[in-house]
Amino acid sequence: VNLGLARIQRLMFLLGDPQKKYKTIHVTGTNGKGSVTAMLASCLQAAGIRTGMYISPHLSSYTERMVIDGQPVSKQQFAETLSVVRDICEFMQGEGDEHPTQFEVLTAAAFLLFQKAGVEYAVIEVGLGGLLDSTNVIVPEVSVITNVTFEHADKCGGTLEGIATHK
């Protein structure tokens, strides 16, 4: 798999760039990303703002990764949205593009689900790294960095500064 944003950027473009239809908060760091993401989403929701939340990994079901106003998306919503994304992925392959990764497909599905649900804000947790992570197709209103340690040093640079740059 080639690291980079080209596949997810193309996929999002073909889906109509749903991630540009609402405001986003991007959360990265080594530890605490999921907790910070959940707290921010909860605060927005408590303020009466329709809110999406995207986290990874899940514990028991893929639908846990995509939350709207505190509730995981339904299996039906998830399946219908994945079907749309799958069709675009097949079109991309037919055009000679590399098939998006599983995480790219899930990220695209989350962003499309949030648009369809009419969220005002989506709080997005980075998957791996940051710089080349597929969630980086968003242009966030706010970026949050929790603590940074030597996690993923092989992929994000061998120094703390290199890792911080990636995150």
Predicted regions and their residues:
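A conserved segment at the C-terminal end of the G1
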Residues: K23, V27, S35-G52
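Conserved beta-strand/loop subsegment of P-loop NTPase cores
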Residues: V142-T149
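ATP-dependent carboxylate-amine ligase catalytic core
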Residues: L5, Q9-K20, A46-I138, F150-A164
